[in-house]
């Protein structure tokens, strides 16, 4: 999504320093307001101060999303997962919130998303909440899918995409005009990436965590779609619905005001 900006394919008018970190680290840094513009989980936005959501760059699942895996020789029914110890990729991830909505309270153990399959395989946890490329690369000879949160969302919500990731800009360090201009530039960058997927994926390979180009391309095509250019009404409604459900289930205490630029 940032390829066109980072490679100078479009003029941004901004001095951009690219920071590459895992999503939960970015969530935590946003809580401390350390970044002017950053990707964060939709869930994390509920706890941020003085950030607004950019209309572009969002990650929305279209009837698919994070999954829960177990060892194949220790399959656990979805309705028993609340009794399990589950590895999670961060408390502030949208995947964690979706899982709480789906199964209620459970014992979660935070770890790097990359370490989760190995922890499940070693029996350190009963199950693992899998995000990113691991959703499509987990070893199906070793693991069984216990719950697909994308399908759960579609079955229970229906008609709205699964809200997972967004980009936010700081209203504390950037003026309203700067945020609006960056939003326009970012939209152009996302469009360029979608129109030039092959070269954009080649650029992304350097951050691909050892995944093949085919895997990264498949993952990109799953989560970089028309809603990534502009989340529009459906994207906003999906985010609002996620927060309303969280409040109804008493996972969150207050209403969350969603501001999109």
Mark where each language-model region is.
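Short, polar/charged alpha-helical segment
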Residues: 1-21
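Short beta-strand-centered segments that line the small-molecule binding cleft or hinge
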Residues: 26-38, 49-59, 139
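Beta->alpha turn/N-cap motifs
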Residues: 22-24, 33-46, 112-113, 130-136
């Amino acid at each position: 999504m940032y390829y066109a900006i980072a490679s100078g394919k479009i003029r941004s008018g901004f001095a951009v320093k690219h920071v590459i970190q895992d999503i939960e680290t970015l969530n935590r840094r946003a809580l401390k307001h350390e970044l002017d513009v950053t990707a964060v989980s939709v869930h994390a936005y509920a706890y941020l101060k003085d950030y607004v959501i950019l209309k572009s760059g969002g990650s929305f699942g279209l009837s698919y999303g994070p999954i829960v895996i177990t060892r194949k020789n220790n399959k656990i029914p979805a309705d028993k997962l609340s009794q399990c110890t589950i590895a999670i990729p961060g408390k502030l991830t949208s995947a964690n919130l979706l899982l709480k909505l789906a199964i209620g309270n459970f014992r979660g153990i935070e770890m790097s998303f990359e370490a989760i399959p190995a922890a499940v395989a070693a029996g350190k946890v009963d199950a693992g909440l899998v995000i990113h490329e691991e959703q499509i690369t987990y070893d199906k000879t070793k693991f069984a899918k216990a719950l697909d949160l994308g399908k759960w969302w579609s079955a229970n919500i229906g008609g709205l995409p699964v809200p997972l990731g967004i980009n936010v800009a700081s209203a504390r360090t950037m003026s309203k005009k700067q945020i609006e201009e960056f939003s326009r530039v970012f939209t152009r960058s996302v469009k360029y990436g979608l129109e030039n997927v092959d070269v954009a994926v080649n650029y992304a390979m350097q951050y691909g965590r050892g995944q093949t180009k085919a895997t990264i391309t498949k993952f990109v095509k799953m989560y970089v779609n028309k809603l990534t250019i502009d989340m529009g009404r459906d994207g906003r409604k999906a985010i609002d619905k996620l927060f309303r459900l969280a409040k109804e289930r008493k996972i969150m205490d207050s209403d969350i005001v969603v501001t999109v630029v």
